[in-house]
């Protein structure tokens, strides 16, 4: 059976057409049998009802076709076959069912991990572009599989895609941070992004840095409250977070810092601090250290 467009319905449309033909035949029969008793207003109402039914059916078919198009775009297995083969309705629905079963088997992690889903589609798109590059080099440029330029380019793109997929897999394995205590005590956070606080940079020896680190961990040490957040040149904000267990910050501020550490994007492109603030903090002439977050702590 030849169809007019990609998503023309087959069985359901035939049934609906048969029902419409039956209704129209019944209406025509009633019209022929009771022609004398039917007024022109009644016949116009019947025609208007048939016209409305056709409009409603067309809108319903368009809604079904749009939903199938969205499923073909959202399901990864159907998205891979988008340019290579024409998919039937049953195939799209079957791929959708298989995809949902796979997500259910994985424990529902894919339902809520929007970043992982975006990375999945980015990897699929990169692989599609890689296949198009290889096809262009072989068909348009006439390069065979042993050509040095093609081998070098394709291997470079393959290695890049593999490295990004491995990095994304390692990055999305990080979960949320649970609180270990109430607000009356210091919460203990064991998160891989909350690294230990580095001591003040010293180029003299390793022992001096270790000694400064132990001074920061002492309860009465004045350096325990003077550690400042500094954004490194590479933009990784997680490596400069202070030790949470010995910090005097309130839990709401700590939760905001933890959410910043779990943010999947880099802050290297955002100018958060001036270059002068990247240097270690120096005491002011009054003897008190500079605390850029002092007003925020007072707000809590």
UniProtKB/Swiss-Prot annotation:
Keyword Translocase part of the UniProt annotation: no
The entry's cellular-component GO terms read: nucleus
Q: Where is the composition biased (Low complexity)?
A: 32-44, 199-210
Would you say which domain of life the source belongs to? Eukaryota
Gene Ontology BP annotations = floor plate development; glomus development; negative regulation of DNA-templated transcription; negative regulation of transcription by RNA polymerase II; Notch signaling pathway; pronephros development; specification of proximal tubule identity
- Mind listing the UniProt keywords for this protein, alphabetically? Developmental protein, DNA-binding, Notch signaling pathway, Nucleus, Repressor, Transcription, Transcription regulation
One Pfam family here: HLH
Q: Where is the Orange domain?
A: 121-157
Q: Where is this motif: YRPW motif?
A: 290-293
Annotated bHLH domain residues: 48-103
Gene3D superfamilies membership: 6.10.250.980, Helix-loop-helix DNA-binding domain
InterPro entries registered for this protein in UniProt: bHLH_dom, HES_HEY, HLH_DNA-bd_sf, Orange_dom
- One annotated GO molecular function: protein homodimerization activity
Q: Where is this region: Disordered?
A: 1-52, 199-232, 278-300
Q: Please tell me where this protein is predominantly located.
A: nucleus
Instruction: Report the locations given in the UniProt record.
Output: Nucleus
What does the annotation say about its assembly with partners? Efficient DNA binding requires dimerization with another bHLH protein. Binds DNA in the form of homodimer or more strongly as a heterodimer with hes1/hairy1 or hes4/hairy2b. Also weakly interacts with the bHLH proteins hes2, neurod1 and neurod4/ath3. Interacts (via Orange domain) with ccdc89/boip (via C-terminus).
Into which family does the record put it? Belongs to the HEY family.
Q: Which PANTHER family match?
A: BASIC HELIX-LOOP-HELIX TRANSCRIPTION FACTOR, HES-RELATED (PTHR10985)
Q: What is the annotated role of this protein in its UniProt record?
A: Downstream effector of Notch signaling. Transcriptional repressor which binds preferentially to the canonical E box sequence 5'-CACGTG-3'. Acts as a suppressor of neurogenesis by antagonizing proneural gene function. Functions during floorplate development. Plays a role in pronephros formation in the inhibition of distal tubule and duct cell fates and the promotion of glomus and proximal tubule formation.
What does its UniProt record remark on the domains? The Orange domain, downstream sequence and the bHLH are required for efficient heterodimerization with hes/hairy proteins, and for transcriptional repressor activity. The C-terminal YRPW motif is not required for transcriptional repressor activity and is unable to recruit groucho.
Q: In its UniProt entry, what is this protein called?
A: Hairy/enhancer-of-split related with YRPW motif protein 1
- The organism named in the record is Xenopus tropicalis (Western clawed frog)
